[in-house]
């Protein structure tokens, strides 16, 4: 049974009233809202470290705070430089500095490398202030991503190793394509669940599961291979078809998936990064300068109540 998603609606241009610092803070809040969202199968949340042995909720918060100034620097560059290869080179250099700051804040753990790429591009594009519609920001971010980075390190990253073995394009391919899993999965799902009067927590969990069900997550492929990816995609789909977050059957299916991912040491980190991107673009479209964390007041129990 296919899960039908609404088509992303077209809206008039939205002009920016936020400066680079405010956009960077919104990106930080998106990262914090993602990690605070509970319960997430295999991921760090308020229950614990998920499938990670080197991360925690506090470390994820610290990482988000450490990289926020670099998002602001990217935005400042976008406002002062032409939108061309020079900016691409500058933003890439800032991104590598952000990775160093992240590693220092987390004692060497990779908390947000993918998010630095994803949200860095989106903050840079949004800082132009031309149009804050999600599709327009994603289009500009994709244009920038596709420009060559002359200083790109020659060492293979985990994502590049996975791409070579499985053909999955990962965060780089997502950006090149204009963030389709954000525009056509995350955002429409979040809107649809709000229209169904879901709690904000459940709406965000629905968005995450829909992304997990479709994304060729290179974080999953690196840890669990093709079999692990199939488990994640089927498990997320099964949870949605069972009723999703907000239903006893759906939450029990999420629990089963969570337990399976912990056993296999699999964490869908790529999907988590795209959920954060979803929350960031959603806030911009809604004209919000803050992303509320509803996790403490809207806890999902995995159907145990």
Q: Predicted segment positions?
A:
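Phosphate-rich cofactor/ligand-interacting catalytic cores and adjacent structured alpha/beta frameworks
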Residues: 1-82, 88-89, 126-259, 263, ...
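Short, structured motif recognition centered on aromatic/hydrophobic residues
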Residues: 118, 205-212, 274-281
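Short, hydrophobic/aliphatic alpha-helical segments
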Residues: 91-107, 250-264, 282
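Short, electropositive, low-hydrophobicity segments enriched in small/polar residues
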Residues: 118, 124, 182, 273-274
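Long, hydrophobic/aromatic-enriched structural stretches that serve as scaffold segments
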Residues: 71-126
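Short glycine/serine- and small hydrophobic-enriched flexible loop segments
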Residues: 120-128, 279-286
């Amino acid at each position: 049974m296919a899960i039908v998603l609404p088509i992303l609606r077209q809206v008039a241009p939205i002009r920016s009233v936020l400066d680079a610092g405010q956009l960077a803070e919104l990106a930080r809040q998106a990262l914090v809202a993602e990690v605070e969202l509970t319960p997430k199968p295999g991921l760090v949340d308020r229950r614990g470290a998920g499938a990670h042995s080197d991360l925690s909720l506090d470390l994820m918060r610290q990482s988000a705070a450490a990289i926020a100034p670099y998002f602001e620097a990217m935005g400042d560059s976008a406002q002062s430089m032409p939108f061309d290869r020079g900016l691409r080179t500058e933003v890439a250099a800032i991104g590598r500095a952000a990775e160093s700051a992240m590693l220092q804040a987390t004692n060497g753990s990779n908390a947000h490398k993918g998010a630095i790429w994803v949200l860095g591009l989106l903050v840079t594009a949004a800082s132009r202030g031309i149009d804050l519609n999600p599709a327009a920001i994603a289009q500009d971010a994709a244009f920038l991503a596709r420009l060559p980075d002359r200083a790109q390190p020659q060492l293979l990253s985990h994502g590049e190793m996975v791409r070579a073995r499985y053909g999955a394009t990962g965060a780089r391919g997502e950006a090149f394509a204009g963030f389709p899993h954000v525009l056509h999965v995350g955002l429409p799902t979040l809107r649809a669940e709000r229209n169904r009067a879901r709690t904000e927590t459940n709406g965000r969990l629905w968005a995450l599961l829909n992304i997990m069900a479709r994304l060729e997550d290179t974080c999953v492929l690196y840890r669990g291979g093709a079999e692990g990816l199939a488990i994640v995609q089927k498990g997320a789909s099964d949870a949605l078809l069972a009723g999703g977050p907000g239903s006893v059957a759906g939450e029990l299916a999420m629990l089963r998936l969570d337990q399976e991912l912990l056993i296999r040491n699999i964490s869908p980190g790529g999907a988590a990064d795209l959920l954060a991107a979803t929350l960031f673009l959603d806030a911009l479209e809604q004209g919000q300068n803050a992303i509320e964390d509803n996790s403490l007041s809207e806890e999902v129990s995995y159907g145990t109540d």
